[in-house]
């Protein structure tokens, strides 16, 4: 089944009409900083860029998406001349905030770039450099939900004693 909701009077904004968007899954795009340390012990680095991603369920039947191929913000920055040459107008980035899966749709901290991708300053630099090439950056911001392994819920205890799961007085608990 399908639900389609739209405004019949909607018009594409002039600023993006006819523009070319290029979607990037940061971890798989380009590794700009090689041999970076893994910031969390449960992450697995795939040095072989042609290796098959882990897709089989683990011993308890879960799919953790914990294998990483090393793509990062500096890698995207390195490819800006190439992307410009291709004629793109916008880069649409899959989630970049700290998370504990390679797809990062289970955000753990909305205030910080995932350390495997770089720093907040690296993101600012990427945006400034992209602008020099006439390329805009659009974030896939998943602000409607977060992961249970996050500073907000903290089910795994990775973020100390705070979080709605561990602290009845948490500001994130309703």
Q: Can you describe what each PLM-predicted range is?
A:
Residues 26-89, 96-174:
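Substrate-binding/active-site clefts of carbohydrate-active enzymes
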Residues 3-5, 93, 110:
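Generic structural hydrophobic/aromatic packing signal, biased to beta-strands
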Residues 1-14:
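Extended acidic/polar, glycine-enriched regions
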